[in-house]
A protein has these predicted regions:
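Aromatic sugar-binding surface patches on proteins
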Residues: 111-119
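Solvent-exposed loop/turn segments flanking beta-strands in beta-repeat/beta-sandwich domains
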Residues: 82-95
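Short, compositionally biased P/S/T/A/G/V-rich stretches that sit at domain boundaries
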Residues: 24-74, 80
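Extracellular and select intracellular beta-sandwich modules with Ser/Thr-enriched
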Residues: 143-147
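Short beta-strand edge segments in extracellular beta-sheet folds
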Residues: 149-153
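Surface-exposed, short loops/turns at beta-strand junctions within beta-sandwich domains
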Residues: 122-129
Length: 153
């Protein structure tokens, strides 16, 4: 019986940890969003193609657009239904670093995605000017995209 109790307790602990990750409750250490090598890549060429804007409303709370920050810094982004629109599907959130090619960094922030927001208490990005692209869909399949520009000193 003791073996079963230990397994049950270990399983319960794993489930609690998984639930914490799923709700964005993991906020222990600073999280590297980009490596030094990725940050050193040439920036993506400027594009005039508009991003989709039919899905959820993306509100970047911090850092402010074009801000100069010191690493680590908080990242807080809210996702809400567009008026008359469907709820955001947080599992469709995608975050990419816009370099000479797009670098998908979504998996690095997944533990910090909650029901309607992304919150990273201490995000780390190497020094430089960086552009990050966020995209998300709503339950109706409509998508919104937004670019966040930040300079890390």
């Amino acid at each position: 019986m003791r073996g079963r109790t230990r397994v049950s307790l270990a399983l319960a602990g794993a489930l609690v940890a998984a639930a914490a990750c799923a709700t964005g409750a993991v906020q222990g250490e600073a999280v590297w969003l980009m490596t030094e090598g990725e940050a050193a890549l040439a920036p993506a060429p400027a594009t005039r193609a508009p991003l989709p804007n039919d899905g959820p409303v993306i509100t970047i709370i911090t850092p402010q657009q074009g801000a100069e920050v010191t690493s680590p810094f908080p990242v807080e982004i809210q996702f809400e239904p567009r008026p008359g629109g469907a709820l955001p599907k947080m599992d469709t959130l995608k975050l990419t670093a816009l370099k000479i090619f797009e670098i998908d960094i979504t998996d690095r922030v997944k533990p910090y995605v909650g029901e309607s927001k992304l919150f990273v208490k201490e995000a780390k990005i190497p020094t430089g000017r960086h552009r990050l692209k966020l995209t998300i869909e709503d339950a109706a399949g409509k998508q919104t995209g937004q670019i966040l520009e930040v300079t890390v000193r």
